[in-house]
Amino acid sequence: MRLLLPFSSPLSATSSPSTPQFIPELPPPSQFDYSGLTKILKKSVIGTLTGALSLTLVFSSPISSVAATNDPYLSVNPPSSSFESSLNHFDSAPEDCPNEEEADTEIQDDDIEPQLVTNEGIVEEAWEIVNGAFLDTRSHSWTPETWQKQKDDILASPIKSRSKAHEVIKNMLASLGDQYTRFLSPDEFSRMSKYDITGIGINLREVSDGGGNVKLKVLGLVLDSAADIAGVKQGDEILAVNGMDVSGKSSFEVSSLLQGPSKTFVVLKVKHGKCGPVKSLKIQRQVNAQTPVSYRLEKVDNGTVSVGYIRLKEFNALARKDLVIAMKRLLDKGASYFVMDLRDNLGGLVQAGIETAKLFLDEGDTVIYTAGRDPEAQKTVVSDKKPLITAPLIVMVNNRTASASEIVASALHDNCKAVLVGERTYGKGLIQSVYELRDGSGVVVTIGKYVTPNHMDINGGGIEPDFRNLPAWDEVKERLSKCSILQQS
């Protein structure tokens, strides 16, 4: 199976307050000089694929493709007392489940042991995944013929142990010359499947029911987590959060509803198995919400112009929500221009980056294209809402602006919503998938890449800024106006 995981973390996350922070003083970056603006800071849809479980990693910093984060969302209002009184009881079973015996049988079906697989079978399974999905973005020397010959040579001799099979897979993947394509031990894959961005110890996945609808299910469950203690089980379907029906919502959206400050409560309505009981569970969150957003208001031109400065350290689960709060507060204070600082932002959740970009784009604007050999990797992401602001915008970037940050910067630049100021960005625009093999191990495979709205390949070359130093706002407005005219023509 193949699963889209809309999450990740940057290389290093720093602890932050639980709400967007208003900054009283900001030291100026040495490499920029702008007299008017002073003291600015530096810085699962499921399908079938050769019997393997694939977690599509739409994320990662340029250094580490897989990392854990504990950054949750802002608080979700606790349920009312009348709602709480109905907790921790079983609701009626679905009408299409005739009796408990059948329900128990259905739940037990999820626990059927996988068939035994040979050492050669594990190697061939990994080979098939690469053969069907790998995108050679570096050497461009990969061909189906040479890959077939490599398999034939490997399987010409018996593989006598599982450890030897794993070693063969490592060497086979290393021969591709792609730093992100690699082998995962069973323990490494298990930890990844229990990756938690919800703050209560679960990892969600989107599952098609075959009829055009998508259900949200628990892919991984952290042992002794709040959800585990409350009675959530792996494979449970999520029906509602704090009384809100989550039908039609993505795993990313539902994760945002689950997150909140430590010690607050969230109410989860779940169904155990296809025909199991429905139960409402009150769960206490375990981690503190941390914001990646800080902001301040600057007065320029002798105090006649107000500029809203916003720094985004990373694109975690809080990024979009806290950015909206910060921008609204700055608008209320009279900001007529904005600076968004993405310097040293290594990325994070790609979905958070995409949703952030949409805040500035017109409905129908292209956010990003994805390209790959697999048709499922070839998509166009489009903004579906009106912009939150239309004021002139500067996006500050440097050589540590990467991944999700580059998606945001290119989307705003190519759609004539912002000018880029600073240094060429890092150039991390690849998409990896993680596939589970039948013995519990896994492989991470590069399956696609991001292409900007202007059809530029981000990976390797990065994005060149419009200006090295901060320009005057009249120059910003002129550049954006010319861009819009060219775009319309």
Swiss-Prot record:
Highest taxon of the lineage: Eukaryota
Reaction catalyzed: The enzyme shows specific recognition of a C-terminal tripeptide, Xaa-Yaa-Zaa, in which Xaa is preferably Ala or Leu, Yaa is preferably Ala or Tyr, and Zaa is preferably Ala, but then cleaves at a variable distance from the C-terminus. A typical cleavage is -Ala-Ala-|-Arg-Ala-Ala-Lys-Glu-Asn-Tyr-Ala-Leu-Ala-Ala
Stretches with biased composition (Low complexity): 1-20
A GO biological process held by the record: proteolysis
Subcellular location: Plastid, Chloroplast thylakoid lumen
Keyword terms of this UniProt record: Chloroplast, Hydrolase, Plastid, Protease, Serine protease, Thylakoid, Transit peptide
InterPro entries xrefs: ClpP/crotonase-like_dom_sf (IPR029045), PDZ (IPR001478), PDZ_6 (IPR041489), PDZ_sf (IPR036034), Peptidase_S41A (IPR004447), Tail-specific_protease (IPR005151)
Active site: S403, K428
GO cellular component, one term: chloroplast thylakoid lumen
EC numbers: 3.4.21.102
Gene Ontology molecular function, alphabetical: serine-type endopeptidase activity
Domain annotation PDZ: ranges: 189-273
Similarity comment: family membership: Belongs to the peptidase S41A family.
Function field: Protease involved in the C-terminal processing of the chloroplastic D1 protein of photosystem II. This proteolytic processing is necessary to allow the light-driven assembly of the tetranuclear manganese cluster, which is responsible for photosynthetic water oxidation.
The protein's name: Carboxyl-terminal-processing peptidase 1, chloroplastic
